[in-house]
């Protein structure tokens, strides 16, 4: 009787292990998602840097929360939490006369990609400091680059 339960337990454990084990295709998919996230962050940074001095100086007055450490995909939760304020600042800078389509599209892409990359795990961000929009985007770009280079080596 115990033998059947033990075998069932072993079979269930093996099934769980094989279904959660990373595969080369999931690694490739993660790599592609990180590349997309990096590209979208760079597009936003380029847009910020293209603003005229008066708009840029106004944008630099807004501060964004940056976590103490950003080393794992779960830390993308912290980026996700700052996406709405980021979008609002970018929309303010664009003004009422221009279309915020590119900004909205980039933010939406970032949100979708972050949700895929971080998974369903909920993570409590420990914020360390506030930074300008340029520093914020640069740090997240650096994070993506470090994860990409670590996974490709």
Curated annotation (Swiss-Prot):
> Which GO molecular function annotation, any one, does this entry have?
interleukin-2 receptor binding
Signal sequence, renumbered to the chain = 1-20
Q: Which SMART domains match?
A: IL2
Source organism superkingdom: Eukaryota
Cysteine disulfide partners in this protein: 78-125
Q: Name one GO cellular component term.
A: extracellular space
**Protein's cellular compartments:** Secreted
Known function: Cytokine produced by activated CD4-positive helper T-cells and to a lesser extend activated CD8-positive T-cells and natural killer (NK) cells that plays pivotal roles in the immune response and tolerance. Binds to a receptor complex composed of either the high-affinity trimeric IL-2R (IL2RA/CD25, IL2RB/CD122 and IL2RG/CD132) or the low-affinity dimeric IL-2R (IL2RB and IL2RG). Interaction with the receptor leads to oligomerization and conformation changes in the IL-2R subunits resulting in downstream signaling starting with phosphorylation of JAK1 and JAK3.
Name assigned to this protein = Interleukin-2
- What gene name is given for the protein in this entry? IL2
